Design a protein with these regions (language model features):
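Residues in and immediately flanking transmembrane alpha helices
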Residues: 15-16, 173
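Boundary at the C-terminal end of the N-terminal hydrophobic targeting segment
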Residues: 18-20
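Sec-dependent N-terminal signal peptides
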Residues: 4-14
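Substrate-binding/active-site clefts of carbohydrate-active enzymes
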Residues: 27-33, 41-254
Length: 254
């Protein structure tokens, strides 16, 4: 019985060894990859000087109101953790990062018309400018340094790419880029609007110009067929018209 147990233990150890070495640099296989998903903003704050950008507010005074603000995580923080061995100690093959491009500057309601909390694009899924990295995450050079660090550890980097839709049109962006006259200052647009009728500010958003205009996107209040998967919008988000074959004008703010 003792010999059988020893033999079983040896077989198990050999199997574990084979599994652990399954994804070397020469034999990498996505089917056996260990993928670690990182929401960059919520991982590690390595540089507090880049915590506030674009007129955003990060602290509204309570934990509930701050639930969807930017919390400070950035490329420097990820690089710091990588150098400490965080990912290698876990046996990670791939780090999957949320989208890194510039997000909408303002916020949208985090809970319907009640506006329980301001919801920013901290998660990377509310893109504004696909040609720039969001300053809250860091710089191009810092991003390259992070990727180089992970590559040196034999870790691949996978990026999110939300190409189906831009982020919501926000009041702060409307003011900063002169999309529309909403009757607010930039500071007022960034504050938590709850005592006013939030939706009234967007009553004319279909006429906003300089943003992603009608040739680019469809909006949910344009009465598209929401049962048609090619025309439906998700959670009221603007939807890029991927089916169009005509050339479109690059938005003025890009």
């Amino acid at each position: 019985m003792k010999k059988q147990f020893i033999l079983f233990s040896v077989l198990v150890c050999n199997a574990i060894s084979l599994f652990a070495s399954n994804n070397t640099a020469d034999t990498f296989d996505w089917r056996g990859a260990s993928v670690y998903f990182v929401i960059t903003d919520r991982f590690c704050n390595g540089d507090t000087t880049n915590d506030i950008n674009y007129g955003r507010i990060v602290d509204y005074g309570t934990e509930q109101l701050n639930a969807a603000t930017f919390h400070g995580g950035d490329f420097k923080g990820m690089k710091k953790k990588a150098k400490e061995g965080y990912f290698t100690d876990l046996g990670v093959d791939v780090v999957w990062m949320t989208d890194v491009y510039e997000q909408i500057h303002g916020w949208m309601s985090g809970s319907g018309s009640i506006n329980d909390f301001p919801h920013y694009g901290y998660h990377g899924y509310y893109p504004l400018d696909y040609t720039q990295i969001d300053k809250n995450y860091g710089t191009v050079e810092e991003f390259r340094a992070l990727v180089d660090t992970l590559h040196a550890q034999g870790i691949r980097v996978m990026l999110g790419a939300n190409l189906n839709n831009p982020g919501y049109p926000t009041l702060l962006d409307a003011i900063q880029y002169d999309f529309a006259e909403v009757g607010l200052t930039p500071q007022q647009a960034a504050e938590h609007i709850r005592e006013w009728s939030f939706d009234d500010f967007f009553a004319q958003r279909l006429t906003w110009s300089g943003w992603y205009d009608r040739p680019w996107i469809r909006m949910p209040d344009e009465h598209w067929d929401e049962n048609n998967p090619l025309e439906a919008t998700v959670f009221g988000m603007p939807d890029f018209k991927e089916e169009r074959t005509e050339m479109v004008r690059i938005p003025a703010f890009l």
